[in-house]
């Protein structure tokens, strides 16, 4: 209760613009709470940390941030956050939120601006489709290995439950897969196969963590790797 009424969300560019506008109005040492420390929340914390202006609180129901990364990279993130005096509240689920206060089961924290980066509720359209077709999923429209939920109907990205974590990397690959199938008029019978090309997260002070199935990087070299990856993505995609 109170999340929709009292929090900003970070899902779209429009959301990001609104957050930026609100941050500009805050006084020095204002209390900014970031709820959800996955990729989105952790990168936001890294960017806020760089401003050296806010008192930041990182909140998550799990035992730490970025649980999709290995333990070493998680610890590097925590070390950087602790060095910068970020208030860390983990293993704590939000009970309800009121103006200026976030309540947990046995605790509470005050805020001037709260940004929700936790799980995003399934869209009304996805809910409606699942209900009409008797599909059961809380993540999105339940699709088969061809990303179909009916013979000539497909779903990808955040609106689809394809059994893969809904990242931008996954959504891009899904889009390319369907584009290829549309272009060849579905003559092949190839199922969608997600290829994990690695995970990257900016954590603040020109430090990033990066890992794939071959290597794991952190710190300044992780940031350099991230800069190179972003360059090649813009240049060749």
Which residues are covered by each model-predicted region?
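FAD-site-proximal beta/loop scaffold in flavoenzymes
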Residues: 5-28, 101, 110-176, 180
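Conserved Rossmann-like nucleotide-cofactor binding loop
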Residues: 40, 64, 121
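Rossmann-like dinucleotide-binding cores of NAD(P)H-dependent redox enzymes
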Residues: 44-92
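C-terminal, flexible cofactor-proximal segment of oxidoreductases
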Residues: 174-237
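Active-site flanking residues adjacent to catalytic metal/cofactor-binding acidic residues
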Residues: 35, 59, 156-157
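A conserved short coil-to-beta-strand element within the FAD-binding core of flavoproteins
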Residues: 90-101
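Rossmann-like NAD(P)H-binding beta-loop-alpha module
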Residues: 20-56
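Short strand-coil-strand connectors
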Residues: 105-107
């Amino acid at each position: 209760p109170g999340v929709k009424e009292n929090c900003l969300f970070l899902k779209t560019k429009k959301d990001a613009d609104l957050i930026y506008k609100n941050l500009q109005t805050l006084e020095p040492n204002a209390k900014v709470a970031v709820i959800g420390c996955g990729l989105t929340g952790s990168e936001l914390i890294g960017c806020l940390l760089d401003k050296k202006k806010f008192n930041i609180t990182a909140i998550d129901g799990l035992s730490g941030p970025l649980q999709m990364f290995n333990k070493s990279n998680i610890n590097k993130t925590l070390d950087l956050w602790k060095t910068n005096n970020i208030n860390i509240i983990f293993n704590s689920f939000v009970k309800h939120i009121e103006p200026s206060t976030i309540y947990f089961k046995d605790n509470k924290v005050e805020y001037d601006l709260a940004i929700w980066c936790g799980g995003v509720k399934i869209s009304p359209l996805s809910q409606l489709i699942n209900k009409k077709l008797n599909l059961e999923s809380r993540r999105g429209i339940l699709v088969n290995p061809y990303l179909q939920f009916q013979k000539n109907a497909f779903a990808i990205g955040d609106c689809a439950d394809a059994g893969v974590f809904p990242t931008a990397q996954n959504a891009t690959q899904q889009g390319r897969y369907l584009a290829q199938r549309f272009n060849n008029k579905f003559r092949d019978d190839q199922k969608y196969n997600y290829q994990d090309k690695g995970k990257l997260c900016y954590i603040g002070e020109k430090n990033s963590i990066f890992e794939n199935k071959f290597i794991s990087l952190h710190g300044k070299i992780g940031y350099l790797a991230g800069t190179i990856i972003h360059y090649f993505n813009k240049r060749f995609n």
